Amino acid sequence: MTQINHKNKVMDKLKSIFLCGIFLLYSLQTSLASVVSTGNFNNDFFVTWSPSHVNTSADGRSRSLKLDQEAGSAFASNDMFLFGQIDMPIKLVPGHSAGTVLAFYLTSDQPNRDEIDFELLGNVSGQPYILQTNVYADGFDNREERIYLWFDPTKDFHTYSILWNLHQIVFMVDFVPIRTYRNHADKGVAYPRWQPMGIRISLWDGSSWATRGGKDKVDWSKGPFIVSFANYTIDACVWKGNARFCRADSSSNWWNKEEFTSLSWKQRRWFKWVRKYHLIYDYCQDNKRFNNNLPKECYLSKY
């Protein structure tokens, strides 16, 4: 009997050690899957278009893109992510920037791609900048919204942020929510929730559509056109091939916590202010475009 009891105690101890090991391994994998980067462009990004038009400071903390008659320019993240928040301070092209487009977005680069877009559309001198946002889910887009910015984005850096989790996507400017796109997959609305996405940033000639529907083209005599970036933060789950780590409600995956499932009351007040005073186009109000058959999400809660 004594030998049996001793054997049981040993087995219980081994079982406890095994379970602790599994827990520690899971915690370690979850922790390793999440990354906080406070901004070295050389470490986190690679140039995808026109290296001669991309200028990075010696310490890697700031970067600029150039557009001229020769080419635009672009860079992309080394990693792919599934949920998190990206904050990118940007200083836009000053003066006459009509026809230029600065795109900051997440994309899965798949045929049925998911994508979350910021597009900053250049202006004629004296006119306000327009910020366009869009969401692709399972290859479908046509979800554009446009606002006028309430400040001059060429005078200083302003932070453009994307919060993305299982519950919602929140577009923010200087941490003011300007748009949400909620997960209504249970109601038949496509939502980006399975495909990891990388960060892409590009500056290019959008003369055919960007400013007043293409009426105002890029004036190359005003160039070159320069956009600057600095002090970004990536706080997101790096894709390692297993979605459950990125979906876990862990201390490192703070964006999955209950408080981020919808806008706070304070955020809702700011959101309503933006929609009331600065919104200039919302696809959910464009009955003509959709032949009076608006997408399902247009009838569902935004927060």
For each predicted feature, which ranges?
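GH16 jelly-roll
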Residues: 2-3, 12-303
